[in-house]
């Protein structure tokens, strides 16, 4: 990397530095995560003031420094003004930014991650409504987990490797979900080998590994998240499934994926806790 270099990146984090500067963390497609000082960015008349704000995409000119790089020029390519005008959208986007910061690499190209984040920010800004914010957020998190190589298994039992068939007829039907095992667990199949404890002990060990239990509606929604776009509810559910149950299911799925991500990345996401205030529901 030369003393001066160019990159295309999105601002994911910023904080005051000194009297008038700003320290920003940027996800670039060419070099992954970089930190840079933006001189004078907090001055009212600075040309870099607005361009160093959260979720602004810029073509950047950066000077390589001994400890910190210095951003000296930025030409805005895209921004997401709609995010800051809606508390729900802003909260969801800040959560995604934290998640990306935990999985992005430094000094390595991150083209796929960069493009995926921008795509989901676009969807949240332009398409998400109060009713569809949770589905958009859940799919974004699932796609990010997939890039990191830790997306949960939702089609097969993590223990038996057998396909899981949802049961909409039996209202008591449930499937387990285990962070440690990596996804769904068929509650009627516990075939771990070679260890064969007594039935009582086996049941205790098995249940302790379950973090959640999912209904047929919840598992079906979870299975749609790997697709590029989410299908309409009437395409995947029987006619007698209530829309209200689907809305609540999305809230639960977001919570499950958040806890799953925290387990696998070994950290909590501060912005994610604010998501709970958007639709307070106890599970």
Curated annotation (Swiss-Prot):
Gene Ontology terms: cellular component: bacterial nucleoid
UniProt record, GO biological process: DNA recombination; double-strand break repair
Domain of life: Bacteria
Region forming the signal peptide: none
Gene3D superfamilies, A to Z: Nucleic acid-binding proteins, Recombination protein O, C-terminal domain
Record key words, sorted: DNA damage, DNA recombination, DNA repair
Role description: Involved in DNA repair and RecF pathway recombination.
Family label: Belongs to the RecO family.
Protein's name according to its UniProt entry: DNA repair protein RecO
Gene that encodes it: recO
């Amino acid at each position: 990397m030369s003393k001066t270099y160019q990159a295309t990146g999105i601002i994911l984090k910023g904080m005051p530095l000194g009297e008038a500067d700003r320290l920003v963390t940027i996800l670039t497609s060419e070099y992954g995560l970089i930190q840079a000082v933006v001189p004078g960015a907090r001055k009212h008349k600075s040309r870099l003031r607005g361009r160093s704000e959260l979720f602004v995409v810029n073509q950047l000119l950066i000077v390589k420094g001994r400890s910190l790089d210095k951003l000296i020029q930025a030409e805005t390519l895209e921004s997401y003004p709609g995010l800051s005008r809606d508390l729900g959208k802003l909260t969801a986007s800040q959560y995604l930014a934290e998640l990306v910061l935990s999985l992005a690499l430094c000094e390595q190209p991150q083209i796929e991650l960069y493009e995926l984040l921008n795509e989901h920010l676009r969807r949240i800004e332009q398409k998400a409504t109060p009713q569809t914010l949770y589905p958009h957020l859940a799919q974004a998190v699932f796609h990010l987990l997939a890039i990191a190589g830790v997306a949960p298994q939702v089609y097969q039992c993590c223990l038996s490797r057998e396909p899981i068939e949802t049961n909409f007829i039996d209202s008591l039907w449930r499937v387990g979900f285990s962070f440690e095992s990596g996804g769904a667990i068929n509650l009627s199949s516990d075939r771990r080998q070679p260890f064969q404890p007594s039935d009582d002990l086996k049941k205790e060990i098995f249940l302790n590994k379950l973090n959640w239990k999912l209904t047929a509606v919840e598992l079906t929604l979870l299975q749609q998240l790997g697709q590029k776009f989410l299908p309409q509810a009437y395409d995947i559910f029987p006619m007698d499934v209530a829309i209200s149950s689907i809305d609540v299911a999305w809230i639960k799925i977001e919570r499950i994926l958040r806890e799953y991500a925290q387990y696998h990345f070994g950290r909590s996401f501060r912005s994610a806790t604010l998501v709970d205030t958007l639709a307070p529901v106890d599970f």
